[in-house]
Amino acid sequence: MKKHFLLACLLMAMGGVYPDVVNAQCGDNGDGTFSNPVFWADVPDPDVIRVGDDFYMVSTTMHLVPGAPIMHSKDLVNWEIVSYLYDRLDDKPNYDLKEGTVYGRGQWATSLRYHNGTYYAYFSPNDTPYKGYVYTTSDPKKGWTLSSRIPHFHDASLFFDDDGKAYIFYGTGQLRELKPDLSDVMPGGVDMKIFERDKEENALLEGSRVIKHDGKYYLLMISWPRGGKRRQVCYRADKITGPYEKKVILEDAFAGFPYVAQGTIVDDGKGNWYGVIFQDRNGVGRVLTVMPCRWVDGWPMLGDENGHVPATMSKPVQGYSSEGLVVSDDFSGEKLKLNWQWNHNPMNECWSLNARKGYLRLTTGRVVDNLFVAPNTLTQRMEGPKCSGVVCMDLSGMKDGDVAGLSAFNGDAGILAVTCQGSQKYLTMKTESVKLDEKNKSVTGIDRNEIQKVELTSDVIYLRLDGDFRLNKDIASFYYSYDNKDWKKIGTDFKMIFDYRRFFMGTKFALFNYATKSLGGFVDIDFFNYQHIKK
């Protein structure tokens, strides 16, 4: 069956299946320019640093693990995931989908810094026990070490001043001094509110990002003015403790979607500055834009000369490309590609790349009654404008009551599920909408809608999920095939959503297999073939 994977990849490269399919990073136009968004995929809460000629970025993935992806770039456009801060979180059993879940919690906005040869990253889950994580490394490509647990600081930004003192900016204008090694807060150190919100702000100021430029301190944040739209603001001061003055540095809708705000600025070492800011785009999640940053009267003004996010501009550095953020996989490697993430901590004994060479085996590890509490659901992002994912599954190892398949996974999920009922297997297109307890995020209810069910005639099945994230679309469509050529649509189109009250992330491709009766059944996944469609 690998031949089907190779053929599909060849057709994709030749443009034979979809004429606008590309392998390259979605923002790179291949002619020295790039188009925004750089990532039309879920890459929220970016923090970016430059060390020499290398850019590093961290983003938020919350309840997915491994978590806190660290990406590397040479040009701010082409990025690749090189590591994660952690393989799992173990503060409480919810991370294992026991006694509740951590949907929409886990790893939130992370701060990334480089100081005296060491890279630092800090984040704090928006959840009990409300303690932050500090990770360090000498090389982001070689993994990270948990070095300390310090107090919870919401949407924080680490900062090392020229005198070696360490600080953390957080919340709505809070400043706290830390020990230089970030092992704890500094006893008797700075602990203050550096400004008060003015009257036009009616909510939290969030997403702190701090830099020092020409002797001044700049704190970038997102704000929501009364009766207005989200925007990027900047507070600046001559002293770290203030007084601070404020200016709006970006207030712009882009391409018909909501306003662009929350991120940071970074220079290229040659005097040029850029903003790296995200934008909400509904079902696909929060997408990444890159734009000029112009210093005007000592303020970092974002966007073009008119303050707008440019649709297309020259790449900051020429000559680089990348595989992309979402990738195909024939599961022939010794490890999963870094593009994959599990939903919550995986049961590592229940998945394998070695049980059957060239296949990913997912073995049932816990008896559950729904996808939202099923362990070992494997995900990748979906991308706009359009994308398509095909998975080939060998179902012969399934047991009675097992459920396996492919999902457009979110709080509202579109699901293409194979169910094993005795000796017969059925394919169902259905939707499920989860209800979560506010305290521990346990599943309190699921609204289910079975749309179409067909009896399968083969133990080898190809499942396809197409996503359309163009303006006012957010549509998922489902198909199946016995030969990867003759495709039959099943069910109806499914509307993908973004809901901060539940998952707080964009919709994901999700591969799954879980038991509803007894353990030990398995499916073998031959490949996942991904196509990104630019038009």
Over which residues does each language-model region extend?
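Carbohydrate-active catalytic/glycan-binding domains of CAZyme proteins
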Residues: V21-K535
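Bacterial Sec-dependent N-terminal signal peptides
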Residues: M1-Q25
